[in-house]
Design a protein with these regions (language model features):
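Short, small-residue-biased leader/transition segments that mark boundaries at the very start
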Residues: 1-5
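A motif-centric signal for short, conserved binding hotspots located
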Residues: 6-167
Length: 167
């Protein structure tokens, strides 16, 4: 796998780069990493600072940890175990995503704008040698998509017969 990582990417540029073995921030917009059931693109964590473009920044989840008083004890189910452990907070800073973990704005592939989802990461690199994310930023809730879609999902995507062999 180490040799594979050193090869040139098949499409675009790498979204994850290391400097002295530690993840570094990107200066280019993340590529499309997938498509949601509603047909909208899912990008990596880096996008334009403003919905109209500008410099590239790591986009932020609008969710924060909010442990409820009636949840099971954290000694049994650790903090952030349940979806209910998170609350979405409205924010006027355009680097924060909406409750669906997306926003409307321009991207390299959609210069006129598109609603898109973004993968979200913690803002700091993990420094714990026992952690599988050591020297990397951990994924951050809701990771890819929030509670709802930004557009109407295609019903075909929910059928059991819809798989890669059918396309």
């Amino acid at each position: 796998l180490g040799d594979v990582y050193k090869r040139q990417p098949l499409y675009g540029s790498r979204d994850l780069t290391l400097s002295s073995g530690v993840e570094e921030n990107k200066t280019q917009h993340s590529p499309i990493i997938g498509w949601a059931y509603d047909g909208l693109p899912i990008y990596g964590p880096y996008g334009y600072e403003k919905s109209t473009g500008g410099s590239v920044t790591q986009l932020n989840s609008g969710y924060s940890v909010d442990l409820k008083t009636n949840r099971p004890p954290t000694s049994v189910f650790p903090q952030e175990f349940f979806i209910e452990d998170f609350t979405w907070n409205s924010n006027t800073d355009e680097s924060y995503l909406d409750e669906n973990n997306g926003r409307y704005g321009v991207t390299p592939e959609y210069p006129n704008g598109v609603y898109a989802y973004f993968a979200t990461l913690e803002s700091t690199v993990t420094s714990d040698s026992s952690d599988p994310f050591n020297n990397f930023k951990k994924p951050k809730f809701p990771y890819l998509l929030g509670e709802n879609f930004g557009a109407q999902p295609n019903e075909f995507n929910f059928l059991s017969k819809s798989n890669q062999d059918e396309i």
